[in-house]
Amino acid sequence: MRRLPVFLVIDVSESMAGDNLRSLQDGIERLIRTLRTDPYALETAYLSVIAFAGRPKTLTPLVELVAFYPPRLPLGSGTSIGAALEHLMGEIDRNVKRSTPEQKGDFKPLVFLMTDGKSTDDMSAAQARWKRDYANRANLVAIGIGPYAALEGLSSISPNVLRIENATEQDFKKFIDWVSASVSTQSRSIGTGEPPKVNLAKVDESVMKKIESIAQAAAVDEDFVIVSGKCQTLKLPYLLKYERAKHAVETSDFRVDTT
């Protein structure tokens, strides 16, 4: 039976600490519950989870939906998107069956790469390799979490780059529902033959916006600072996440909100 491999490639760097990581953890469970109600997805979709920070790691290898158990997302330092792409390409080579003269292989993998930051490694070699060897072998969808995710590197290798403008709990739920609907749509479309391109569900523009240009893809977050340290007593690493707070300045003559 031909499978539809689905890879979730998730940024678990320090900037994801807190609500974002917790929402993605809950989102994976929500995704599986929804897909298990779709007979088309149950028949064809196989899911894998790859987490990356400074280094990538496969948390769950490709497995059918009925046997999938949501992994616990770790937390790390760094945002090595280039290394994550190299790891993803290795997973595709090892686990996705290619067509031969004797039999057809798996359908084109569907990849959802999610990040809230800018790559901390050199992506150029991975970008070139993806465009040369994998752009026609897999459908990559890149999602920026929050208004400050720098997606210019990914927009050069995929026409499907989107941004979640406000990473609220409800927005994450709607985003996960969109991922689920996209997997279901792709599962249904391959029933009549392999589609020439990815078939995604309609984007809810109140939650996500498609990136149309390199200028839209670049952003810098000046409201957060992440500091890493090591406990002198326990010798364990820790993270401190600071958010710029707004303050109200008021005198007898005027009132203004400042940062």
Where are these regions (language model features)?
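VWA/integrin I-like adhesion module and closely mimicked acidic/polar interface patches used
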Residues: 99, 117-157
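Short, well-ordered amphipathic alpha-helices
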Residues: 28-36, 87-97, 126-130
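Short glycine-/polar-rich loops that comprise or flank the Walker A/P-loop
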Residues: 3-4, 107-108, 136-139, 158-159
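Von Willebrand factor A/integrin I-like adhesion domains
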Residues: 147-204, 208, 227, 233
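Von Willebrand factor
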Residues: 1-60, 67-107, 110-114, 139-153, ...
